[in-house]
Amino acid sequence: MVLIKEREMEIPVIDFAELDGEKRSKTMSLLDHACDKWGFFMVDNHGIDKELMEKVKKMINSHYEEHLKEKFYQSEMVKALSEGKTSDADWESSFFISHKPTSNICQIPNISEELSKTMDEYVCQLHKFAERLSKLMCENLGLDQEDIMNAFSGPKGPAFGTKVAKYPECPRPELMRGLREHTDAGGIILLLQDDQVPGLEFFKDGKWVPIPPSKNNTIFVNTGDQLEILSNGRYKSVVHRVMTVKHGSRLSIATFYNPAGDAIISPAPKLLYPSGYRFQDYLKLYSTTKFGDKGPRLETMKKMGNADSA
């Protein structure tokens, strides 16, 4: 494992190539430490075609420039900021692609056939990586290899989708966040991000840790609220945000390996805690409390699960 130093905080980098040799035990221990103590880390040698990753980034950037940039800068939010006014909004241009259990990419405006095919190819490789990572997490938690996958599954398996976002240049970065402070609602988040423009920050040990741009197409991973519940609090979701910058437009392609909407979520039986709830019920609560403290939200769901099992 390599450690990237950023403002005296070392960000774990897990080398998946070391999982197949004599260093496997050490690498598994380092992965467990990253999940347990950090909630975010980078993965190198993940097995995803790096030329394909470059192609995805290039095509998404071109799509933004051609179809979304002008619309963003003509929005009421941008006009208000030019007058020094702020609102509870995020300085981002984004859309969401659902991949599994059903795809919606053909319904998204101005997505070319080439971009659609390229995303499908990338997501296919990324899905295999997500499943491999979930199995490794299960192993470290003392669970059966497919426990996370099974817990996340509805009738058609776990949900898999991608938030594509650009965080454009902002004339008043002191007044706006690219994305306000929050934890992620779902399970395992796999981020392909900009290799030049920074902005992502995670909160750890009382301070904000800036995440550097991803060189050499490493995958940045963080764990969401449902993995915290499933692991009975061992693998915690972490508060993060995106800062705006005056110069440079940051790209973020975040893919979510999530429970199906009707999946029943509870801590794994081997890790105790008896309650369970539907992920879609959690999302309803999350939609109104996303930018608040996650603690009361998780406690509410625990109580709901206890009531349902009583």
UniProtKB/Swiss-Prot annotation:
Instruction: List the Gene3D superfamilies.
Output: B-lactam Antibiotic, Isopenicillin N Synthase, Chain
SUPFAM superfamilies linked to this entry = Clavaminate synthase-like
Binding residues annotated for 2-oxoglutarate, in chain numbering? 250
**Domain of life where this protein originates:** Eukaryota
Catalytic reaction annotation:
1-aminocyclopropane-1-carboxylate + L-ascorbate + O2 = ethene + L-dehydroascorbate + hydrogen cyanide + CO2 + 2 H2O
Give the metabolic or biological pathway. Answer: Alkene biosynthesis; ethylene biosynthesis via S-adenosyl-L-methionine; ethylene from S-adenosyl-L-methionine: step 2/2
- Cofactor(s) required, per the database record: Fe(2+)
GO MF, any single term = 1-aminocyclopropane-1-carboxylate oxidase activity
EC number of this enzyme: 1.14.17.4
Residue ranges constituting the Fe2OG dioxygenase domain according to the UniProt record: 158-259
Q: What does this protein do?
A: Enzyme involved in the ethylene biosynthesis. May promote stem elongation by maximizing the extensibility cells, possibly by activating ethylene biosynthesis, in response to very-long-chain fatty acids (VLCFAs C20:0 to C30:0).
State the similarity comment.
Belongs to the iron/ascorbate-dependent oxidoreductase family.
Its protein name is 1-aminocyclopropane-1-carboxylate oxidase 1
What are the top taxonomic ranks of the organism? Eukaryota, Viridiplantae, Streptophyta, Embryophyta, Tracheophyta
